[in-house]
From Swiss-Prot:
Family: Belongs to the SEC23/SEC24 family. SEC24 subfamily.
Record keywords, A-Z: Cytoplasm, Cytoplasmic vesicle, Endoplasmic reticulum, ER-Golgi transport, Golgi apparatus, Membrane, Metal-binding, Protein transport, Transport, Zinc
GO terms, biological process: COPII-coated vesicle cargo loading; intracellular protein transport
Described function: Component of the coat protein complex II (COPII) which promotes the formation of transport vesicles from the endoplasmic reticulum (ER). The coat has two main functions, the physical deformation of the endoplasmic reticulum membrane into vesicles and the selection of cargo molecules.
Biased composition annotated in UniProt, kind: Pro residues: 13-23
Keyword Transit peptide: no
Positions bound to Zn(2+): 271, 274, 293, 296
Protein's name according to its UniProt entry: Protein transport protein SEC24
Region annotated Disordered, chain positions: 1-51
UniProt source species: Chaetomium globosum (strain ATCC 6205 / CBS 148.51 / DSM 1962 / NBRC 6347 / NRRL 1970) (Soil fungus)
SUPFAM superfamilies linked: beta-sandwich domain of Sec23/24, C-terminal, gelsolin-like domain of Sec23/24, Helical domain of Sec23/24, vWA-like, Zn-finger domain of Sec23/24
Membrane topology label: Peripheral membrane protein
Underlying gene: SEC24
Region: Zinc finger-like, residue numbers: 271-296
Amino acid sequence: MSAPHDGYGQFPPQQPTEQPPYPDQGYANPADAPPPAAGAPHAADHGKKKKRAYAAGAFDVAAGGNAAVGGQVQGGGQFGAPAPGYGGYPQPEAQPATYGAQPAAYGAQPQQPYGMPAPAPAVGYQAPEPYYPSAGAPPVPGDVAGLASGMSAMNLGPGAHQQPQQVPAQGRVGPLNQLYPTDLLNQPFNVSELDLPPPPIILPPNSSVTPSPDANCLPKYVRSTVNAIPTTHSLLKKSKLPLALIIQPYAALHDLDDPVPVVQDQVISRCRRCRSYINPFVTFLDHGHRWRCNMCNLTNDVPQAFDWDAAAQKTVDRWQRHELNHAVVEFVAPQEYMVRPPQPLVYLFLFDVSYAAVSTGLLATSARTILDSLNRIPNADRRTRLGFIAVDSSLHYFSVPKDSDENGETSMLVVSDLDEPFLPVPQELLVPLTECRNSIENFLTKLPEMFANNQNNGSCMGSALRAGHKLISPLGGKIVVLSASLPNVGYGKLEMREDKKLLGTSKENGLLQTANSFYKSFAVECSKNQVSIDMFLFSSQYQDVASLSNLPRYTGGQTWFYPGWNAGRPEDAIKFASEFSDFLSSEIGLEAVLRVRATTGLRMSTFYGNFFNRSSDLCAFPAFPRDQCYVVEVAIDENLTKNVVCLQTAVLHTTCNGERRIRVMTLALPTTTNLADVYASADQCAITTYYSHKAVEKALGSGLDSARDMLQSKVTELLQTFRKELAGGSMGGGLQFPSNLRGLPALFLGLIKHVGLRKSAQIPSDLRSAALCMLSTLPLPLLMQYIYPRLYSLHDMPDNAGYPDPETSQIVLPPPLNLSSERFVPFGLYLIDDGQTQFLWVGRDAVPQLLVDVFGVTDRAQLRVGKGALPELDNDFNERVRAVALKSRDHKAKGVGSIIVPHLYIVREDGEPSLKLWAQTLLVEDRADQGMSYQQWMGTLREKVST
């Protein structure tokens, strides 16, 4: 019998006080509390309290798990009422909230600093004059659209012969970010803080040549670990904070999803000495005929064509040029930027056709997905080429005829000599997609049948890679490996070395390192010839991901791992097909190099990511992916004398449509001599990303223990430094830290307890190695979720959650909860999502009506647990739950490109123990396996800091 709709449970009414409260925070003033999370309704919005279904009885909206972060505050106050701003910063009226007045780089809703009203649109620097008119000139409107009339009044419009002398940037007016210490023990971290934008970048007035709101780089492209740069190496060293850039040049898989301004006229003005590109932070001199480089101070001539439109044969308004208004621009490169004609897009597929690959359905699913994705593979210039090699203990080449060849049949050529595999007919092995479309379709349709009865267990993948490299190295391109077995014959032969007795011991470290030097040396050789490798690995047995992942690591590729994959499970087949199709459709760059230049005194010292470091400051990418980020550590070699420093990232690449381009991203940051300014401007998410890369490097070099110890010692060092230098040395029984870094201990704990790094005797080395690949490549928003997953309470969602927001049309998510079992109630329904896997947790006392509405069953025993999908039922709550689960995996809303489609696992609290345990390992703040709880962690840190 279903329960009536005004209170679905058959239990006595649930009192709000009976639910596990947020750990006592001891806020004397509600203003000191953490902010409401994205999408959380303000207390005042509740009006009359609505009764919720699905609880053990009816209860208030503000009760339950979500009340802790987004509900009403006792006494009628609101979180952050007379609020300090970001992490406690009060925001002066003239002070910008964040670069470019954009919402947080990720998060479902634009986030304001804690409890503050929406600020006026910011422009990336403080209170600029609308323009810099010469004496007696009329003022100019502040918006870019209004510049034209003002320019003509100053004789600066089209046809003007003189540019004005630019007024130099003035000395800093007003303070940088204020430092607001907080007690980590009494005012603990709240997960919603991870959605806040970084501390604002506050530049002196007139720092940029135009008042464009896009003059400074958005954090989704480039973030600094500190948004105020110490002027000396000694001050940076004293702070113990890292100085590094987190760089994600592309925020989407396709240009249409994240367009940037393109300079088409091929007029590229660069500094003669340091080769920086002209940008919004240069200075014009000599009536606009010359410009001073903001990196090295050299004076350069402005190109004559800078103010001339060659196509229209008329002068143009320089102040409208993209490179003076936008921190992120893309230049179409002229001939001198090309060593050879732009390479075409080339995909060479290496299919594992051994018994393991055929029996799991990998070969059939791969071939079908490529067939279905032929229209998605970029081919606008009609030069894209494809090639196919099948691999077991021999190499099977396929010569695909052109469609115009009437009697053409795809022929297979088998080569068994693995020592020096020759190329039978190279010109027919890489064929143009446009000219051979029908033949390729026929071949892919027949391919699974050719090997349907193959019993061969051999895999000569190393030899296949050498043959593939030989085939495509004259052109360059991508080798895509689809393998379900360990390479066990020929070059790069690997042994089964997994030993469960070694897991969790110091000897485990050897399993994470390469077993055969072939993989690194071959990868470097590939990089030199513009060959990139992507690995799609599917084995249910040991596959040595540690060794194979070297191939993508040094060639700008990625390792995708599907443990225990089988096409017989629809969820497995759908996930891979979706991800592989998006992978093929991605508008990658080719033959790319990345370089970061900076103001004199700064030097790029260390680079992290999947590429080959060709020289001290040049990173080489045979292919440039759109779903990875890179970390560059910055050293201060000389004292910085300027108020503002700039760091400019340039990516020279060939688009997959055959155009040579340079993407330039310029970030301007203020300098300071004050340690408090450095701490107040520190970005906890960027710092965590930097240390994630450092921890992976440490794990692969010195072992997992060293990586975990390094993370603990670093966070301890920061707490000690803050106590000694900025908290007066006194702790008063608490643990002082800046409010903008309040999440750092929780994020570091998440890293230490992550599947890639945690101490455990239960984690297969392949799983660990794949996790380390993710920890060192994921874009920052996805990395934060991977380290500290999202937890949503669904049974008591706010009334607007799961519906589109009226203004943005985006699905509203419930406020996220901290990762602790204290958040859970036995009758609850929760979503846990780390970006790779989603768990739908069903409480042991979930009421029948909840089960009916969400799953279409009346009894928990009927619930199909494990990997699955939510049924589509014709009721409002089912639609909302599905909408939340789908929105939680929305990469575009987070400002990133990604192909990942997380699996969904349905977990019953009283169901299968192993599944329940796996889900619980994501509850970072709980004690699990050999990892400590958040309370124990904070106690440990306090002891270390006070000794």
